[in-house]
Amino acid sequence: MHVRVLFFGRLKEIVGMAEDTVELSDGARVEDLFARYGAKFPELARFRSSVAAAVNQQYAGWSAPLNNNDEVAFLPPVSGGENPSAESATARDVCAIVRAPIHASEVANQVKAPADGAVVVFEGIVRNHSRGKATLYLVYEAYENMALAKMREICVEMRTLYQIDRILMLHRLGRLEIGETSILIAVSSAHRAAAFDASRFAIDTFKRIVPIWKQEYFRDGAVWADGEFPVAQPFPSQSESK
């Protein structure tokens, strides 16, 4: 069987490519595929405990079986076909990956409606320092199709947990200068508490499960800012929500 393989972030640098196509024996699993590359790239093998895998844009375990024409992505820790129900549940919401500058004052008005009593806007911006050094700029990359799917999943879960009206979620890719906006989340609701709580849930969950990575550039070089890996159950239960 043939499998398409994708690498991101630091893993892409280790193997020297972003994409590959390999032929595997029937019955092969994710761990077999990773071992194949690990044998060729010993540095990659040493990162096994820190690598996540996705099969056809869904997080998968090492023992997950592979099938012909599967797309397998090996992912460093995140900085961070679509479900039909998610599409219908988020028909009023906006989730997008963009490359142009994000201007909060221009896009936040999209979530306002006459029935709303509150709009909360979270804006993540590029700061001028990290790791005790001056930051020159950042570069973001993403597993785009999967990132959009996970963003929509977050919107669906937000509606399950909180009484909110509209959601807008944007993340920018490419080179960002100091002070520019990397992510914007806007939430409207009849009441402020729900809008605040939903916004906090959205950014915290986004940082854990959406496959987007940033590379920090300094005067003496660049590093990938790896965050935490997604967990098996990314969303809190109803009892844990406020």
What are these regions (language model features)?
Residues 1-89:
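Ubiquitin-like/PB1-type beta-grasp interaction modules and other compact soluble beta-rich domains
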Residues 4-6, 14, 71-77, 83-182, ...:
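N-terminal, polar/charged subdomain of small-to-medium soluble alpha/beta proteins
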